[in-house]
Amino acid sequence: MTDQQTNGAAAEDNSPQFSMQRIYVRDLSFEAPKSPQIFRQTWEPSVALDLNTKQKALEGDFHEVVLTLSVTVKNGDEVAFIAEVQQAGIFLIKNLDASSMSHTLGAFCPNILFPYARETLDSLVTRGSFPALMLSPVNFDALYAQEMQRMQEAGEAPTVQ
């Protein structure tokens, strides 16, 4: 066995660190403008999904990431319901280079938040007396790569607020 000696101070750990601190709903809304009449119609829905992510640096090495899912469902030409959730998380992220930090905030964290947002939307929709809303998984890595390509072509640099 070998003994390692230190000068009394713990060696500083510069290895990358990531941990979830909190997952929470930041905002939630549901509108069914044509109820109760919409419930008496034949159900032939069309679904439009819009998603967006935002991130901002908090104190120290903490970051907030917010995933917004907005769903508009029409039955024929009429809006059956509009539902939106802002699912947020606070993450401790340390010792990452700029590229890894950008990817973590732009793809990895939204991947963590998506199942929570999807379940919240589904619960909200069924409580509104509509059929379950089964959203397909989203490839945030591909969306992140597309956004980085778009920014590169536009001569923009990724930023972390």
From Swiss-Prot:
GO terms for biological process: protein folding; protein tetramerization; protein transport. InterPro entries: SecB, SecB-like_sf. Keywords: Chaperone, Cytoplasm, Protein transport, Translocation, Transport. Its main location: cytoplasm. It is found in: Cytoplasm. GO terms for molecular function: unfolded protein binding. Pfam families: SecB (PF02556). The keyword Cytoplasm applies. One of its GO terms (cellular component) is cytoplasm. Homotetramer, a dimer of dimers. One homotetramer interacts with 1 SecA dimer. One of the proteins required for the normal export of preproteins out of the cell cytoplasm. It is a molecular chaperone that binds to a subset of precursor proteins, maintaining them in a translocation-competent state. It also specifically binds to its receptor SecA. Belongs to the SecB family. This is Protein-export protein SecB. It comes from Pseudomonas putida (strain W619).
